Amino acid sequence: MKLFDEIPAERPATPLLDTCEHPAALHDFNATQLRQLADELRAYLLYSVGCTGGHFGAGLGVVELTVALHHILDTPYDRLVWDVGHQAYPHKILTGRREQMSTIRQFGGLAAFPKRDESPYDTFGVGHSSTSISAALGMALAARTKGERRRVCAVIGDGALSAGMAFEALAHAGHVDANMLVILNDNEMSISENVGGMASYLARILVSKPYTVMRENSKRVLSHLPGALELARRTEEHVKGMVSPATLFEEMGFNYIGPIDGHDLPTLVQTLGNMANLEGPQFLHIKTCKGRGFRPAEADPIGYHAITKLEKTTSEPPPKKEPRSPNAATAEPEAQPKPQPKPRKYCNVFGEWICDMAAVDARLIGITPAMREGSDLIRFSREYPERYYDVAIAEQHAVTLAAGMACEAMKPVVAIYSTFLQRGYDQLIHDVAVQALDVTFAIDRAGVVGEDGPTHHGALDLSFLRCIPGMIVLAPADEAECRAMLSAAYHHPGPAAVRYPRGTGPGTQVASNLEALPIGEAETRRSGREGGVALLAFGSMNGPAGEVAERLDATHLNMRSVKPLDREAILAAARDHRLLVTLEESVVAGGAGSGVNELLAAEGVQVEVLNLGLPDDFVEHGKPAELLAACGLDAEGIETAVRRRLETSRADD
């Protein structure tokens, strides 16, 4: 295997890979050719992701597995399902999309994850974790029903295996004796370090004290018996089978093999070739290294989970700053430009707030489902380890865990991405809201998130949160409001959510205090022409709303609170303006604008309303600015929509 210390600056020579337009080309490759193909695939993957940015470490770790699977299986007739999809870049390259990799995660280009309408080789669309075994089982049972002899394989990581859904599928597959192969890609990592009983079980079982004591005592006894020690060595693997991961999976009805080296290509090919044709549920456990072949990624698998295209780098340290010239020291202070503060990421605002609040309230508990880094809980986890819980990829459990803590007068804060809260929705309703429990939800990645596409956009949360009785829903316009709203939600005696977008805010100065913003009170940011237009903006839409208000001499209200709405502000706007325009970075159906419509209808107020938000569709991948423009939610799109409505209204008068 070729190892790399830096990402290739030029496209590497890949003569064998260039001949593989489809996976069928791999079927006749010998062992030498497969090894060459794997090396070329890894080199091309490094170059490609270095040019575009994207998910990095996971794909490098499954190069050999991907080559072996497409060598053995007759895809797409045989079904191959990748869990999550972070590791699917090598699969995309081998399935006819090599020349399109330069467009991955870009507007109009290849998707970040497997996608059914992108390629027949992508048998199941993914993005969230732990769905692969259920989907593959469905395909296997459908093949049985139709009398088709097709092989079905699911590839799942050890992080995704921590979710209950994966075990539900394993139990069912064993019960119905399905013809399918499950491959556990065990790299001891998910996005953050793996936690939970399963990760600990897989890691510790063969080095546990009872097992090692039994083994050493047996060796001492058997060493006095001729030939017995050699016999013990030969039977040790059978003893391991009594206490190894095989115990768990074989009790579920699977034939367990492993663990084997997931980078040993000949062993992979031989093992997969044997297992793929066996009847019944098969389970192959492979051990891999995330970032394999690129030394910096092997050393820092979390940091190299994904990279940007600017990180074409190396293991070398950053360049040193040039020393200041002697003349610079004598320059007048007034001559130096005053550095502008960099806009802060919303997740960093949350990370600082939760540490500050924890310092003054010992009841605060921080909970996250495997998103410590993304939610910026690293500092909190270190300063308050006894009050920090990473529950792994278990969103349902995270929400109900918080509910249980709230029952005991604790103050849990659940840090979760908008798209992943969808997985804990029943628990949010049944376990938190019905009981009016005091749980705060810090909802990150609200609205369009960019290159990861429709499975990761936070487009639905305003709609599914607003309809829950007793729920408080707040949407900050900037970093300062985000901190103040987190305090407001935390002090509210019931379920409350603050939803904020990915990335940086507009650069507003953030206070260091913990003062709360009043709930349900809008802010008038601009008073426009009476009888004209009023823009009612929620959250991130206050940015473009400010621009449009200036162009149209319109009133601009920062609504702040999605639920409850500021009744008085809305009624006043309806009284003084001919057109109300609601703006939200969420789907219109059931969202904040719908709430305004419902309030006006309940009050019997007749005024023209234009609701602008994300479309009734799944928004594709691309840069957030591109996506918002495509949805008509940039300043130009909003202005055009408002002017068009005004022209239509005048024509009807």
Curated annotation (Swiss-Prot):
Cofactor stoichiometry and binding remark: Binds 1 Mg(2+) ion per subunit.
Output the Pfam families linked to this UniProt entry: DXP_synthase_N, Transket_pyr, Transketolase_C
Give the matching InterPro entries: Dxylulose-5-P_synthase (IPR005477), THDP-binding (IPR029061), Transketo_C/PFOR_II (IPR009014), Transketolase-like_Pyr-bd (IPR005475), Transketolase_BS (IPR020826), Transketolase_C (IPR033248)
So what does this thing catalyse? Answer: D-glyceraldehyde 3-phosphate + pyruvate + H(+) = 1-deoxy-D-xylulose 5-phosphate + CO2
Q: Where, in this chain's numbering, is thiamine diphosphate bound?
A: 86, 127-129, 159-160, 187, 294, 395
EC number(s): the record gives 2.2.1.7
GO CC terms of this entry: cytosol
Q: Which SUPFAM superfamilies match?
A: Thiamin diphosphate-binding fold (THDP-binding), TK C-terminal domain-like
Question: Which terms are listed as keywords in the entry?
Answer: Isoprene biosynthesis, Magnesium, Metal-binding, Thiamine biosynthesis, Thiamine pyrophosphate, Transferase
Q: A single GO BP annotation from the record?
A: isopentenyl diphosphate biosynthetic process, methylerythritol 4-phosphate pathway
Q: Where is this region: Disordered?
A: 309-343
PROSITE patterns listed in its UniProt record:
TRANSKETOLASE_2 (PS00802)
GO terms of molecular function: 1-deoxy-D-xylulose-5-phosphate synthase activity; magnesium ion binding; thiamine pyrophosphate binding
The family annotation for this protein states: Belongs to the transketolase family. DXPS subfamily.
Q: How does the annotation summarize its subunit structure?
A: Homodimer.
Q: Which NCBIfam families match?
A: dxs, PRK05444.2-2
HAMAP family in the record: DXP_synth
The name under which this protein is listed is: 1-deoxy-D-xylulose-5-phosphate synthase
